Structure formats: C-alpha cells, structure tokens
C-alpha cells in the first residue's frame, strides 16, 4: 500500500495547557469539525472521545495522552491530547518528545497559569514550535490582551496576535482576522460549523489597524527582503506575511496567538487553519540524531527511503488486544507482521498488528511510514523511551529521562487472593508510566509505590481496582526525604580479616565534599602510584553507592555529594573486590556521620487563586504550613498567591482550602526543589524513622 498523504502535508502536534484551560474540549471540537465524530462530546457530561478512561470521565481531567488522526484541508493531522494536571507532567513530556508542533491553550481570564509554565518549559526543552489559543473568551472576566501580556511576562516568549476579539464575555461574537482584515462571526444553529466573513466593526477599526501594523513590523524583522519593503513604506502582501509567520513560528522567533471559545464553538476552525499554515511538517524539523552499536553518531532523515527507526513513547494496556505500544516513525517504513529490533533492550520483536488510533477506537492498517504515529500490538519487551529500528541498521535515538517520585505510599492487598494479582497489576502500571515506581521496603517488607503527587497515586490505585479487580489498602502518604552532608571530611575504610587461611583485606581513604543542591553524586578517583590497583576502584565506588541508599540519619537516600578516593593500601593475596566494596561502604558511613549530615525535604511551588475576601485566611494557613510567600498578584477579582511550601505540610490541603474558602479557591502545586528540614522538625522525623526501623527488626 503506497503512502496516501505526502510528508509535507503531515502535522504531528499536541494540545497542551493548564488543567481546565479547555484542552480536551478544544480537541473534541477539532474532531467534530474535521468530521471524525458526528456528535460533540462534552467534558461536563462525561461523553468525550479523547478522555476514554473511566476515571477521566468521572473527574473531567485528561490523564493519558490519547492519539488521534484527523484530516483538514488535505492535510493529515496526528493530534495528541495531553493532561494538564501537574501530577501527569510526565505524560506531557512524553508526547512533546515525539511531536513536531503544539497548540498551547490558555484561559482568557487567567492567562498563563503555573502548569502552563511547566509545559511551556518542556516544549522549549524539545524545541517544539507553538501556536497559542486564548480560549474561554465567553467567560466573565475574559481579557484577551491581558492573556497575551502574560505570555510575554511569565513565559518570556514573544506573542504575535493574529486576532482581535469582537466583544468579550457573553458579548463575544467572533474575531477580527488581522491577515485578511475581516471580521469572522459564527452560526449558532450549525454549532459553529458555518461562519461568515464580515466587515470589521467600526468600533474596532482603529485597534485592528494598530495590531495589523504591529504584525507587519514583527514579521518583517525576521526577513531582510520583507524588512527592506517595510522600511520603504510598502504594504506586505498576505502571501508574504503568511510565509514570514510560518518561518518565524518554525524558528520560534514568535508564537502566533488566536482567540475563541471552544465550548461555544467559536474559533476552532481557525486553529486548524493555523496548524496547517504555521506548524511544521516532519520535513521541517531537524533530522533525528542517535548513536549506533559502537557509539558513533548517526543521523536519520525523515524519509521513507531511509532505514526504519521509531521511538516508543507510550505503553497502554487495552482490554481487548493487550499491550499497545504507541510509537512515532522517524524514518523508513514498517509492515504489520514484520520484525523490528529494539536497540535499547537488544531484543528482536514481532509486530503483530498495526493500529491507527482514534482516541479509544481503532482502525487496523497494513503499513506505517516516516512521520506516522501509530500503535503496535504484540511487543512484549518494549517500554516507554525505547528505540525500534531495522536490525541491519541499528540506532539508539536519544532516551527520555523521567523524574524521581516525590511521594510514597505503602500498599497491601485486602485478601490473600489479591496478593498475586496486585503484583501483576503494579508491574503493568509501571510499564505504562515510568514516573510510577514500585519497590519493597527491605526492613518492613511492605510494598511501597511512589509517584508525582497524591492524585497520581490515587488514580493508579483506582485503576488497579477497575482494570485488574485488585482491592488494596493504602497507607498514609510518606514524603520522599533525602539526606546530605554539609562539610568536607576525610574518613578511613578498613576491612581486614586475617586469621589463618585466605583472609580479606580492603583499605581506603575517602574525602567527602558537599555539592550544591541538585548536583547529584560524583565519584573521583584520585589514587596515584597504584596504591590501590585499578580493578578495586570500581568495587569501592559500588560500596559507596550502596551505602548511599540508606543514609546515616534516618535511612533516607543520600544525595548531592562528591566522594574522592585519595589513598589506601592492598594485600597481594588477601585483597578482593568484596573486601574493597565493604571497605568503601564502611569508609563512607563513617565519613557521612562526621560530615554534619542534614535531612532534606521536597519543597513545592504552590499557586492559590482565591477571592479577595478569603485572602487573609489563605495566607495565614500557608504560613502555618511553613510556607514562604513570594508573590501576590491581583487578577480579575481574585488574588493569586505564589508560595513555596514543604510537601509534608500539603497533605489534605485541598479539603482544608475548600472549607476555608467555601470551595471558591483553587490551587495547583508542583515540585520545586529540595531544601534542608528545620532542626526541630528533623529531630522528630529521625526519631520516628529509627522507631519504625527498630520495630521492623
């Protein structure tokens, strides 16, 4: 089967935003207008196509990125709807990794919100060109130009307004298109599917003219030819402007901004036009870089003629077909039933079937080409971030990195019968979600699950019950504390057992240095003159790393320190790898205890939006939680309070905030950094941790 759509007409893009900015609604409208669905799904009715997991429909939030294919103006759109809740940031990171462009949706009342900043930074990291959609123009307090300003102020980005709204709040009727210099209004009878171009309303004529002039000036800046024409006072033609906007968007010099209200069906077709006109096709993005089996750099161009290469970016367990592996094809082509080589795991796997996904409906296809996003059935070993490629042309594309959990919960099956099922369920969920970790506490024997927040773990436990019929009891959330050292010390590790027969001899001197926060662990071999033979250096490092998993204060992992191995001795006969590993571990423990160890805790960046009347209560409450308030901004009748608060103090905050503000305040939080725990509180934590450890023995 030959390719039906040329590569230049592909658009792989994601819809990204803060929770509640209206991403899923926008996607639903896109599916409606592109003719994929015949009835619009509503989030508040729980009938959306993209939010197909049961919990998503109940909670009205998007958890997994559903991938959908649609068509507009003879272009093939592969759309990925991403979650906006901070606990699911990993999903956003995964989808951005495989997208070429994105549409960032903002709330016209709030403008840029905290999660919008996080997602925007992730898109910057992967250099994803974006267009912006200011949604919810029909809401009370909607202010398009304020929202545009927040893109400039909070994201440090350069917005390029292509629209001026006609009316706002309940008077919002449409927008002025600054390229065509026409007004656009929508028919309510056809659910916005039909719209008219009208003359620009007289009261907006001056403003439209002003913004058109700004548009021409901004676009002219990126092209010498256009700049010369602009400086000569000649007007730029629409074609020239379109070309310039496309170029500036692809180079991320600026970000086109549109407006509308997806819920009221106004402005969605304009998003689709902008996706086609301004976002990149797979041909416009740089060739994919990777390494071959020998570690040499390899480049894969976006072409069907190149060897096959793809990146698995999501694993999902489907009740009907089992494991689905979502992947993005970067080069070459692949037929259903053929074999692929997983170069990350060094395994050959057979692709059973290939599916084109439309949210949770699927269409079987025979072949995929460069630029496609599809799902494969039958891959057993592949997990998120793995490279799939042709066996005769192996390549490893750059891997994704996933954050460490900030919260842990003990979990146990309700009955003996649930025991085995729980193990299988946790393993499956871990395959799907790399930011979800499972381990067994060696001292207590409990199963501990870790994730990015309370909601994250709550939903995973809920999925265990719904999808795997496993009932489990869940403990209280535990904070992922860490330990570190605060001064440089030297320590000796001696492990010498010489009593008849072959003995054990390991001896080393270590220097421990504190590192700046977030720097991690560093090991330096400063041995000179072979006082310790080369083959024993690695065991010493291994011993140190094992000792670091259980700190000297309360048994929490140690971070942000450097260990320098600078002296020691060995015995010709009695020295062994094991002896030096034990010596390394002993030396580290002794040094860490002397190096003024301290406890670290995760600090969260919290943003609370509250009506003015409750501001005092909210601030007082944050202060009582050891919060540090660092900004307060008035915004459309509400106050936005930004603070840093220890995670340990944030459990149950949602309920407290609701009761303090009669449910009128909202908040969002995300991990900011680790910081030292105050001495008085650290003492309690250490005593408690030691008590638990003693009780387990």
Curated annotation (Swiss-Prot):
UniProt keyword list: Cytoplasm, Elongation factor, GTP-binding, Nucleotide-binding, Protein biosynthesis
Domain tr-type G residues, every copy: 8-283
GO cellular component: cytoplasm
Chief subcellular location: cytoplasm
Domain of life of the organism encoding this protein: Bacteria
HAMAP family, sorted: EF_G_EF_2_B
Protein's job: Catalyzes the GTP-dependent ribosomal translocation step during translation elongation. During this step, the ribosome changes from the pre-translocational (PRE) to the post-translocational (POST) state as the newly formed A-site-bound peptidyl-tRNA and P-site-bound deacylated tRNA move to the P and E sites, respectively. Catalyzes the coordinated movement of the two tRNA molecules, the mRNA and conformational changes in the ribosome.
PANTHER family: RIBOSOME-RELEASING FACTOR 2, MITOCHONDRIAL (PTHR43261:SF1), TRANSLATION ELONGATION FACTOR G-RELATED (PTHR43261)
Protein name in the entry: Elongation factor G 1
Lineage: Bacteria, Pseudomonadati, Myxococcota, Myxococcia, Myxococcales
């Amino acid at each position: 089967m030959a390719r039906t759509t040329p590569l230049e007409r592909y658009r792989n893009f994601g819809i990204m935003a803060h929770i509640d900015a209206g991403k899923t609604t926008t996607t639903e409208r896109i599916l409606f207008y592109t003719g994929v669905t015949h009835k619009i799904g509503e989030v508040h009715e729980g009938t959306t196509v993209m939010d197909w997991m049961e919990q998503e429909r109940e909670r009205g939030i998007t958890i997994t990125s559903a991938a959908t294919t649609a068509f507009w103006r003879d272009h093939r759109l592969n759309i990925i709807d991403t979650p906006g809740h901070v606990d699911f940031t990993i999903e956003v990171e995964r989808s951005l990794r495989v997208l070429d462009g994105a549409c960032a949706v903002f709330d016209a009342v709030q403008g840029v919100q905290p999660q919008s900043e996080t997602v925007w930074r992730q898109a910057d990291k992967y250099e994803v060109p974006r267009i912006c959609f200011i949604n919810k123009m029909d809401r009370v307090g909607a202010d398009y130009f304020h929202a545009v300003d927040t893109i400039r102020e909070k994201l440090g980005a350069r917005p390029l307004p292509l629209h001026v709204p006609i009316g706002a709040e309940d008077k919002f009727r449409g927008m002025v298109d600054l390229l065509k210099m026409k007004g656009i209004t929508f028919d309510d009878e056809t659910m916005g599917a039909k719209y008219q171009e009208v003359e620009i309303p007289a009261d907006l004529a001056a403003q439209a003219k002003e913004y058109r002039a700004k548009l021409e000036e901004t676009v002219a800046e990126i092209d010498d030819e256009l700049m010369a024409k602009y400086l000569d006072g000649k007007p730029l033609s629409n074609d020239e402007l379109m070309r310039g906007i496309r170029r500036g968007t692809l180079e991320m010099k600026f970000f086109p901004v549109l407006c509308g209200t997806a819920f009221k069906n106004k402005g969605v077709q304009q998003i689709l036009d902008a996706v086609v006109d301004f976002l990149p096709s797979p041909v416009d993005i740089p060739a994919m870089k990777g390494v071959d089996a020998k570690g040499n750099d390899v480049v894969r161009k976006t072409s069907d003629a190149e060897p096959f290469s793809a990146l698995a970016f999501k694993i999902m367990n489907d009740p009907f077909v089992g494991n689905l592996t979502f992947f993005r094809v970067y080069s070459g082509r692949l037929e259903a039933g053929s074999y692929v080589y997983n170069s990350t795991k060094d395994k050959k796997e057979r692709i059973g079937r290939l599916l084109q996904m439309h949210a949770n409906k699927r269409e079987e296809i025979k072949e995929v080409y460069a630029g496609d996003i599809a799902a494969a059935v039958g891959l057993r070993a592949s997990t998120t971030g793995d490279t799939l490629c042709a066996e005769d042309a192996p390549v490893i594309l750059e891997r994704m990195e996933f954050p460490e959990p900030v919260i842990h919960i003990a979990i146990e099956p309700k009955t003996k019968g649930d025991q085995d099922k729980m193990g299988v369920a946790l393993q499956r969920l871990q395959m799907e979600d790399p930011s979800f970790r499972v381990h067994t506490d060696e001292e207590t024997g409990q199963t501990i699950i870790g994730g990015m927040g309370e909601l994250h773990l709550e939903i995973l436990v809920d999925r265990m019950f719904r999808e795997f019929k496993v009932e489990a009891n869940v403990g209280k959330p535990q904070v992922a504390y860490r330990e570190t050292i605060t001064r440089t010390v030297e320590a000796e590790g001696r492990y010498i057992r010489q009593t008849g027969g072959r003995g054990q001899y390991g001896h080393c001197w270590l220097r421990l240095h504190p590192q700046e926060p977030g720097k991690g662990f560093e090991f330096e071999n400063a041995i000179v003159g072979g006082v310790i033979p080369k083959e024993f250096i690695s065991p010493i490092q291994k011993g140190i790393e094992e000792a670091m998993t259980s700190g000297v204060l309360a048994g929490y992992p140690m971070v942000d320190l450097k260990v320098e191995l600078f002296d020691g001795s060995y015995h010709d006969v009695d020295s062994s790898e094991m002896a030096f590993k034990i010596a390394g571990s002993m030396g580290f423990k002794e040094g860490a205890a002397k190096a003024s160890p301290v406890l670290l805790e995760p600090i969260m960046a919290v943003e609370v939006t509250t009506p003015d009347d409750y501001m005092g209560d909210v601030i007082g409450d944050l202060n009582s939680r050891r919060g540090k308030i660092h900004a307060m901004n008035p915004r459309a009748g509400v106050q936005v309070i930004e603070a840093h608060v220890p995670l340990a103090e944030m459990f149950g905050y949602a309920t407290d905030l609701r009761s303090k503000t009669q449910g009128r305040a909202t908040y969002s939080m995300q991990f900011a950094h680790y910081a030292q725990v105050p001495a008085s509180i650290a003492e309690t934590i250490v005593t408690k941790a030691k008590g638990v450890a003693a009780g387990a023995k």
